[in-house]
Amino acid sequence: FIQSPSDPYLITLFQKKIDAFSNLSVDEKIAYQKRNEAAITGYVLPAYETLIKGLTELLGKGQNEQGLFYFPKGQAFYEYLVKREVGDSRSIAQIEEEIKQQLVADYQAIENRLQTASHTASASSQPSAAAASVSGLSTAALPALTFLSDISTDSITSASFADDSTDAVAMLKDLRKKISQDFPDIPAVSCEVKYIDNSLKNYLSPAFYLTPPIDQYTENVIYLNPAENCRGLSLYTTLAHEGYPGHLFQTVSFHAQSPAPLRFLLAPGGYTEGWATYVEMYAYSLWDGGSDATVVQQKNRAFSLGLAALLDIGIHYHGYSLADVSAFLTKLGFNASGASSLYWAILQAPANYLQYYVGCLNFQHLRSTMQQALQEHFVLRDFHTAVLDAGPAPFSILEKLVAQKLGVTIS
């Protein structure tokens, strides 16, 4: 960020945005640009230099370079973190067991689809038909997953888009049209797709939704990272996660109800990221109607997230080291070279993967509960409406609100 103090992106991006603003004179634009540059060079850059100096002095003084498990009361803090960030009040053991069961189910679904699909990997790369099991990081016995590398989302074409399509705007329109049957109407809003500046491409995710101000939710922006080369099915489901019916859709729906501002601060990530992941999985069926190849990709995506969530618990609650993670991934057939980056990503953000994956599992469980209670009277659109009307909340509270909305008695 400060390696090129004469050309940091906070200056160049501001200049571009001001130049594009039509309601200012040339002199006014220059004045604003000079004020911004003075603030960046006079305050922001020196502040970063001070931060760097302070952090450098702390290097080597850390008492723990592993998970929360190794801190005093680290396990208790992780339990609290999961309850707060995910909104799941179950014990870690219960959550962990559900993750394992879902991993097995997804793996078996992948096996079944690959065995029946005519355009999958060669026979030599097919997985064994042996039953899969996950009994823990140290004794996991899932068959190898290397066969999944033979399948590319770039070869899965929908009726509306080419397999290498990068038309994000058209995909968002397609998603908004196709979800109308299963999701409620929301106020008309704008959504602009932008691409991040080249100076940020190495530091940001493939895409992100920029949460709008609470008093201006009708103008929305989704940023894409061109460095990720996201296209086809991968781009489509990413846009479902960030846009329709994901973050943008949920955010606009909630804002339109004019909730108390405090609720924006109390929203657990398990609801927001769990919802976005839940509808991302839903969107796979919208791409081509649910072919075997698409279902395999959906299950593979879910399996990958579940694996990361299981490792999150392993690292922070059970105290697994980088060597443990590497051995675990190797046993599953993954390249151990990626273990280090995954380990450090999980280490820096405890319970983060659980927000996505366990949040998604909670929505799937809630949907299943309502379906069982309502039987033939269950309507998916009504369920989604009840979830969105309730807004972000811990799942124990959300279940009560949704049940009340749908007229279901929870024992």
For the regions a language model picked out, list residue spans one by one.
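N-terminal maturation segment of proteins
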Residues: 1-411
